[in-house]
Swiss-Prot record:
Pathway: Amino-acid degradation; L-histidine degradation into L-glutamate; N-formimidoyl-L-glutamate from L-histidine: step 1/3. It comes from Salmonella newport (strain SL254). Its EC number is 4.3.1.3. SUPFAM superfamilies: L-aspartase-like (SSF48557). Keywords: Cytoplasm, Histidine metabolism, Lyase. GO terms for biological process: L-histidine catabolic process to glutamate and formamide; L-histidine catabolic process to glutamate and formate. This is Histidine ammonia-lyase. Its main location: cytoplasm. GO terms for molecular function: histidine ammonia-lyase activity. There is a cross-link at residues 143-145 (5-imidazolinone (Ala-Gly)). Contains an active site 4-methylidene-imidazol-5-one (MIO), which is formed autocatalytically by cyclization and dehydration of residues Ala-Ser-Gly.
């Protein structure tokens, strides 16, 4: 199990990926403690002095003008958590819940939230014990923060709701007891600090980014395989072409293709003096299209990494000045827009892959047997596999519709513009699954195409990609049940079988 020392505000993308992929033992760096304690002292001073401050001794949302008596402050925070735990839909899996929890801890430990160290440590204890609150997938509009998901997370701290422990759903009180933990009672400001924030939206989009990175790398490998399978030219990847345009993503993608294809191969030599002048766009323009996608991935990474380390609470406690200031850091518009742009990239990666599959089906374009199988007519080969890829690509076009342009006012128009970031991030998962299915079909098709070149081989890395598939999926000599092969190739992609062939590109 990974051990991680959390220095608030300094999480890296690789650390976030590890948190998503694996259970973690978390430890808070001691440098955070003074800031946490100072913010709590500031909140305590406000209460003691009888000053009015939003979220500390007032109601919430449209009820912000309602002053709460000191004796009701603890009940106020508990009531907030209970009432806001109103999510619906399937529970998030343990990996997603773990990522949300670590993001929440990272934000709270920055020392701007007025939440006690003991509560932050209780959250850390949940992560370390593998107690995962039941968080429904739906119910947040991404402003004022991810209220419903984070309320469900916070329920477990109070011993309410349900949680998973060692793979079993249990009443939260029972899960805590089995893990040797105790519920906590919240003090002034703490319920709001737990609920306000963009951590669910950010976690949703981060998963989309992690999957998009794998898809991008896999698609570049499969694009190179297809280039070889249909006797495509290496010339469009010449560095001089891309330097002349100056788009960095395009330059870097062309470099990846040169790395994978190398200068030549037995296949390339076999058509060195062919009559073709230019390849179709789906081959020739791969650096331009995939380069644009890479640029979106990089920009999304920049936004999400900043948000993962951000303080997205409200109000914020500035202990050095003794002030509590209301703002709008809970508004997840940066995450929503980043997720929308990432959706375009995921859709285009799949769309270009589908076009390359279609190219291989056409004997006039590919110079291969129709649908990549001998004895056509008796055998249908990849005919319907390409239809499946087309169906998935079409679904992604609809799913790529932007969410950040939508808004519905909530809380009696007090919260009159929202981001829809959770939905923007969550749909990326379905899009990624669709695109992975498309790339799986291309991998199968491209390897079949190279097989049909009768003993000619590609570059060492591309031959490794072909061998990886052939260890699990045999060459098609005649029709057979196709779906298990797509499923197998899809699983290999998800495990990073092709991604590991590509140098770091982010």
């Amino acid at each position: 199990m990974n051990t991680m020392t959390l220095t608030p505000g300094q999480l890296s993308l690789s650390q976030l990926y590890d948190v998503w992929r694996h259970p973690v033992q978390l430890r808070l760096d001691a440098s955070a403690i003074d800031g946490i304690n100072a913010s709590v002292a500031c909140v305590n001073d406000i209460v003691a002095e009888g000053r009015t401050a939003y979220g500390i001794n007032t109601g919430f949302g449209l009820l912000a003008q309602t002053r709460i008596a000191d004796e009701d402050l603890q009940n106020l925070q508990r009531s907030l958590v209970l009432s806001h735990a109103a999510g619906v839909g399937d529970p998030l899996d343990d990996a997603m819940v773990r990522l949300i929890m670590v993001l929440k801890i990272n934000s709270l430990a920055r020392g701007f939230s007025g939440i006690r160290l003991s509560v932050i440590e209780a959250l850390i204890a949940l992560v370390n014990a593998g107690v995962y609150p039941l968080i429904p997938a739906k119910g947040s509009v991404g402003a004022s923060g991810d209220l419903a998901p984070l309320a469900h997370l916070s329920l477990t701290l109070l011993g309410e709701g349900k949680a998973r422990w060692q793979g079993e759903w249990l009443p939260a009180q029972t899960a805590l007891k089995k893990a040797g933990l105790e519920p906590v009672a919240l003090a002034a400001k703490e319920g709001l600090a737990l609920l306000n924030g963009t951590q669910a939206s950010t976690a949703f989009a981060l998963r989309g980014l992690f999957e998009a990175q794998e898809l991008f790398a896999s698609a570049v490998v499969c694009g190179a395989l297809t280039t070889e399978a249909v006797l495509g030219s290496r010339r469009p990847f010449d560095a001089r072409i891309h330097a002349a345009r100056g788009q960095q993503g395009q330059i870097d993608v062309a470099r990846l293709f040169r790395h994978l294809l190398t200068d030549t191969s037995a296949i390339a030599e076999s058509h060195h003096h062919c009559h073709k002048v230019q390849d179709p766009y789906s081959l020739r323009c791969q650096p331009q299209v995939m380069g644009a996608c890479l640029t979106q991935l990089r920009q999304t990474k920049e936004v999400l990494l900043a948000e993962a380390n951000a303080v997205s609470d409200n109000p914020l406690v500035f202990a050095d000045a003794g002030e509590v200031i209301s703002g709008g850091n809970f508004h997840a518009e940066p995450v929503a827009m980043a997720a929308d742009n990432l959706a375009l990239a995921i859709a285009e990666i799949g769309a270009l892959s589908e076009r390359r599959i279609a190219l291989m089906m056409d004997k006039h374009m590919s110079q291969l047997p129709p649908f990549l199988v001998k004895n056509g007519g008796v055998n249908s080969g990849f005919m319907i596999a390409q239809v499946t890829a087309a169906a998935l690509a079409s679904e992604n076009k609809a799913l790529a519709h932007p969410h950040s342009v939508d808004s519905l006012p909530t809380s009696a128009n007090q919260e009159d513009h929202v981001s829809m970031a959770p939905a923007a991030g969550r749909r990326l998962w379905e899009m990624a699954a669709n695109t992975r299915g498309i790339i799986a079909v291309e991998w199968l098709a491209a390897c079949q195409g190279i097989d049909l070149r009768e003993g000619l081989t590609s570059s060492p890395l591309l031959e490794q990609a072909r061998q990886t598939l052939r260890e699990r999926v045999a060459h098609y000599t005649q029709d057979r049940f196709f779906a298990p092969d797509i499923e197998c190739a899809t699983a290999l992609l998800a495990q990073g079988a092709l991604q590991r062939l590509v140098p770091d590109f982010m």
